[in-house]
């Protein structure tokens, strides 16, 4: 029996494939490489010494997708594929409803047809909106503020309805906080295209000299040093969270929602200082206006994942910084030969 990983060539997907292979799962990948490169998958195989089966298919193509279910004994699906750029989703919401929501409908329809009813879904902490208290538990009220977040919430709700209609489904919804870092080999990592929107890839691009300085978005928030606080989680810890969730999804028939975070927050300046100390580099920065729509503080209560999945994040901020830097240094142009131009970068 194999695990189908949609979007398996992407940032989180490729790291998760390593942990799945290390745990002796057979892995089949469906990816259209719209925001990734097949080289990532060669490197996953190089790191693990194991082989994976790869289909270059767009999830919206149901007929092609059926072929994957016909040719393999799929036991469960980990569903990463989708677009993730918040700003792009505001400009082009229909693209996001098509590529995230419709493609998930297509996936679940095919799963149902082939009687594969175990799914682990990549959601996001973005579904919580503005938290009134901290840390954020899974039963906090949801409030989405952009089309990207709305697609995540709608998919979560859709999966609930699917379960209500047929309780032989088993569904794990994973709400990620802020994944950063890279595999310690330095062979795979986050292949940001253009100017990154997110903090860690921006820092590494300043450190390598590709960008001049970090723009710190605001220093008057009600936080220890006035800069925004987030729950950064090492991508390999996150990947392991998927293996833990997968086991539970296969064993049980229920809908589970889990925060995947470390449970502690770091400010922008704390991350910057940690990066400098982990790499012995100096990263220039300047303070700018706050980014519209940003929340001051955001961090997870990850107790449920520990109690019910037996999972918790282990890696330190220092390891996240060191690994992010190793990836950047060894791969200044990411995966180099990009196969197709991306439609999405966060
Ligand atoms: P990514 O862009 O690196 O990976 C997504 C993968 O899906 C890519 O390989 C892309 O080519 C593929 N893909 C996209 N649309 C497809 C389609 N229609 N058919 C087939 N393949 C398709 O993104 P990531 O950072 O690895 O994120 C994975 C998932 O986790 C996404 O659903 C994202 O919304 C979610 N998420 C990510 C973050 C984050 O900070 N990276 C945070 C919260 C949630
Ligand atoms: C982003 C996503 C969100 C996703 C989350 C987790 C956006 C708008 N939001 O939010 O949907 O769920 O990641 O992966 O992309 N910062 C700077 N300078 C920079 C970049 C960031 O100061 O150049 C600050 C931000 O103001 C914030 C912190 O760094 O305080 C983290 O920012 P970022 O990495 O973009 O993550 P989120 O804001 O949490």
Predicted regions: what is each one?
Residues 1-182:
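N-terminal Rossmann-like NAD(P)+-binding domain of SDR-like oxidoreductases, especially those catalyzing
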Residues 202-346:
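C-terminal substrate-binding subdomain of Rossmann-fold SDR/epimerase-dehydratase oxidoreductases
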